[in-house]
Amino acid sequence: MFVDECVVKLQAGDGGRGCISFRREKYEPWGGPNGGDGGRGGDVILLGDDDTNNLVDYKYQPHWNAERGEHGLGKDQHGKDGAHRVLKMPLGTVVIDEATGKPVAEVVEDGQQIVLCKGGNGGWGNTHFKTATTRAPKRANDGHPGERGTYRLVLKSIADVGLVGFPNAGKSSLTCLITRARPRTAAYPFTTLHPQIGIIDYPPDRHGRRRLRLADVPGLIEGASENRGLGHRFLRHIERCALLLVLIDMAGTDGRDPREDYKHLLRELELYDPALLKKPRLVAANKMDVEAAAANLSKFKRRHRTVDVLPLSCLTSEGIELLKKELLKRVTALRGREKVSPRARD
C-alpha cells in the first residue's frame, strides 16, 4: 500500500524526578544531601531515509513516544536519560502542525535529522538546594514534561525527472526500461495506482557514479484538476522535479489525437499549478513501431514547432538509450553535477 499523507501524534519523554536523599554512613549519621538529578527525556527525531518511499508505517500506527528519563537516586546518582524515538521519513516529507496549519519542518536529505519534539529536562535532586542556612534541604524538582504535538505528514517526492502522460501511454513500460523500478505493466489504463520512484543508472565518469531519480505518477485524464481519476492527487510528487518528461501515445490508440492529448495534458498541469508549465519539459513520442505513428509525429511537430520531441518505442526499445542520455544532459545543465541525485543509493 502506498500512503503519502497521514496524521501522527508525537510525545517526547518527560524528565525524571530529582531525588531527596541524605548521606548516611557509619561515623556520619547526619550527612548532607546527596540526591541525584532525574534523567532527561528522549527526543522524537525525524530521520531522512532514501530507502523509505512512503508513509504507510505511520498511517496505521499514528502514536509515537520517546522514553521518559529515569528518576534520580541517592548517592548523587543521576537518572538515566530516556532513549530517543527515531522515525525514518522518505525524502520530500513536509511536516505540518495540525494546530496552526503551518509547515514546521521538511525532510530533504538522506541522513538529515530533525528534532521535532524535545524531551523534558530532569528535575534537580536536593543536592542543588543546599545553602549556608539550609544544610538538609527536603526539596527536589519534578522533571519537565516533554514536548508533544499532532502533525500532518505530506510526502512530496524528490526526483530529477517527473514522468506524466495519459493512461495507457506506456509510462510503466518506459519506467521499467530506463530505471530499476518494476511497476505493473498491462494493456489497460491505470496499471500505475501510486507514484513510482525509479533510479536511472549511468556509467561512472571521472567524478564517480551518475544517476537520476524519476517519478512516475498515475496517468492523468481530462478533468484531473477536478479530482477525476488518480493523477491529480499525486501531482505534488512532480512539483520538485527539475524536468518534466511528457509521454505521448503517438500511435493514436483508440482514435486519440496526439496533438490534442498534449494540449489537454498541459491544461491539466496548469489547472493544478501554473508553476508546472514553467518547468523545462521534453516530449517522448512512444509507440513509434506502429504504422500510423510516423504520420502523427509529423502532424505533431507542425503544430508544436517549439517543442523538443524524441521518438521512441517501448516495445522495440528504439530511442531508449538516446532518451536516457538526453535526460542526463538536461538535468545536469539545470541542476549542476553536484545536485543530480547525489544521495540516490542501491
From Swiss-Prot:
Obg domain location: 1-158
Keywords for the protein's UniProt record, in alphabetical order: Cytoplasm, GTP-binding, Hydrolase, Magnesium, Metal-binding, Nucleotide-binding
Molecular function as annotated in GO: GTP binding; GTPase activity; magnesium ion binding
Cellular location(s): Cytoplasm
Gene3D superfamilies, alphabetized: GTP1/OBG domain, P-loop containing nucleotide triphosphate hydrolases
InterPro entries per UniProt: G_OBG, GTP-bd, GTP-bd_Obg/CgtA, GTP1_OBG_dom, GTP1_OBG_dom_sf, OBG_GTPase, P-loop_NTPase
Named cofactor requirement(s): Mg(2+)
Entry protein name: GTPase Obg
